[in-house]
């Protein structure tokens, strides 16, 4: 008699297993649906943070499952596939951390570790406050607005400020570049009391260099002139 135990589930056992855990599966799928549908920085920030945590957990989970697949492969072909996928997951995870650390070194913002974006926008207000926001790519134009005393850019709430707090230049940093945007147009309302309620600013991409935001912040008052 063979001492090996067959651990394969048949159809009836699979159905029973699903019936036993269907409530957990339903709740888990609903959680993922809410996270993916509403997890945007421009919508509900709390759900967006949960989404980032889920994405951060996926890479270590993939690596762990890949290692288990390498230890217990179904056959030789499965072992080769498991090794390839695990190595790819490890390289991708390491590459993410390298790029994120390079971006953090350039802009000093925790948005650098956002797994959904490759760039971080920075607005250094004239009152000394620094506003950072995640941005998916480097645009040609940025248009921050002030509405009811609150600064928004790319649809994201940044800070409370006044129209005269906006600087001459703002920045979008990537892992290897600093993109400089120069203010080319602004509208700060009329004389009927709207000046402090709404303002629009247009910044066009002017130049690209390899500097860091820290060098700009400590470079004197020329930034705000």
From Swiss-Prot:
Major subcellular location class: virion
Gene Ontology annotations for the cellular component aspect, listed alphabetically: host cell Golgi membrane; membrane; viral envelope; virion membrane
Record GO terms (molecular function): structural constituent of virion
Stretches assigned to the Virion surface side: 1-20, 73-77
Keywords of the record: Glycoprotein, Host Golgi apparatus, Host membrane, Membrane, Transmembrane, Transmembrane helix, Viral envelope protein, Viral matrix protein, Virion
Membrane topology value: Multi-pass membrane protein
Signal sequence region: none
Membrane spanning stretches: 21-41, 52-72, 78-98
Localization annotation: Virion membrane; Host Golgi apparatus membrane
Ranges facing Intravirion side: 42-51, 99-225
Family statement: Belongs to the gammacoronaviruses M protein family.
Subunit structure: Homomultimer. Interacts with envelope E protein in the budding compartment of the host cell, which is located between endoplasmic reticulum and the Golgi complex. Forms a complex with HE and S proteins. Interacts with nucleocapsid N protein. This interaction probably participates in RNA packaging into the virus.
Known function: Component of the viral envelope that plays a central role in virus morphogenesis and assembly via its interactions with other viral proteins.
Protein name, entry field: Membrane protein
């Amino acid at each position: 008699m063979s001492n090996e135990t067959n651990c394969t589930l048949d159809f009836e056992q699979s159905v029973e297993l699903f019936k036993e855990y269907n409530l957990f599966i339903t709740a888990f799928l609903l959680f993922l649906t809410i996270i993916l549908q509403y997890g945007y920085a421009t919508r509900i920030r709390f759900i967006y943070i949960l989404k980032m945590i889920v994405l951060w957990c996926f890479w270590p989970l993939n690596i762990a499952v890949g290692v288990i697949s390498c230890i217990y492969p179904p056959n030789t072909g499965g072992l080769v596939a498991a090794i390839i996928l695990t190595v790819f997951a490890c390289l991708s995870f390491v590459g993410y951390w390298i790029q994120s650390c390079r971006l953090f070194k350039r802009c000093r913002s925790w948005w650098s570790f956002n797994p959904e974006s490759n760039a971080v926008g920075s607005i250094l207000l004239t009152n000394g406050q620094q506003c950072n926001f995640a941005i998916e790519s480097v645009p040609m134009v940025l248009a921050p607005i002030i509405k009811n005393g609150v600064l928004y850019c790319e649809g994201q709430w940044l800070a409370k400020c006044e129209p005269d707090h906006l600087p001459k230049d703002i920045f979008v940093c990537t892992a290897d570049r600093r993109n400089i945007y120069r203010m080319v147009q602004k509208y700060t309302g009329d004389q009927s009391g709207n000046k402090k309620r709404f303002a629009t600013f247009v910044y066009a991409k002017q130049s690209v260099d390899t500097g860091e935001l820290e060098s700009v912040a400590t470079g004197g008052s020329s930034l705000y002139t």
